[in-house]
Amino acid sequence: MKVVLLKDVSKIGKKGEIKNVSDGYARNYLIPKGLALEATPRVLKRLEAEKRKKEEEKIQIKTQNEELLKMLKKFLYKIPVKAGESGKLFGALTNSDIAKAVEKIADVNIDKKFIVLEKPIKEIGMYDVLVRLPEGVSGKIKVEVIQEGKN
């Protein structure tokens, strides 16, 4: 019997796949437990419509993220921090601090997990910081770390 898997099933397949299994296994285990549906033309048509809808949503999210990144790139994010005379920071600037600066300057709430730092920033200066948004959208924003009280 052909079935459409509704969830990942070990040793059978992943969600959305169409698999051939024995009639007894399908009727007595997969279908009653809600792990699969019989692959009728109606079910296949519905599955295809759901796939199309998910693809359209992915494209829409990617477009929105590209627009967001384009907008974020327009700003220079100046972050005042406490630092010594040599330019070394007291502490370090993390992705969380940069996310707060983006929210304050660009008025966009961005999760800190989307800001990628190879290592925490520990000195005053200009930095290109990678922003990696969902759906493979990524780019760099300019961050200037300045000493508190100086412009």
From Swiss-Prot:
Superkingdom: Bacteria
Positions of disulphide bridges: none
Q: Give Gene Ontology CC terms.
A: ribonucleoprotein complex; ribosome
Q: What InterPro entries does the record tag this protein with?
A: Ribosomal_bL9, Ribosomal_bL9/RNase_H1_N, Ribosomal_bL9_bac/chp, Ribosomal_bL9_C, Ribosomal_bL9_C_sf, Ribosomal_bL9_N, Ribosomal_bL9_N_sf
| Annotated PROSITE patterns | RIBOSOMAL_L9
This protein's UniProt keywords: Ribonucleoprotein, Ribosomal protein, RNA-binding, rRNA-binding
List, in alphabetical order, the Gene Ontology terms for molecular function in this entry: rRNA binding; structural constituent of ribosome
- Primary role: Binds to the 23S rRNA.
Question: What is the protein name for this chain?
Answer: Large ribosomal subunit protein bL9
Give the species this sequence originates from: Thermosipho melanesiensis (strain DSM 12029 / CIP 104789 / BI429)
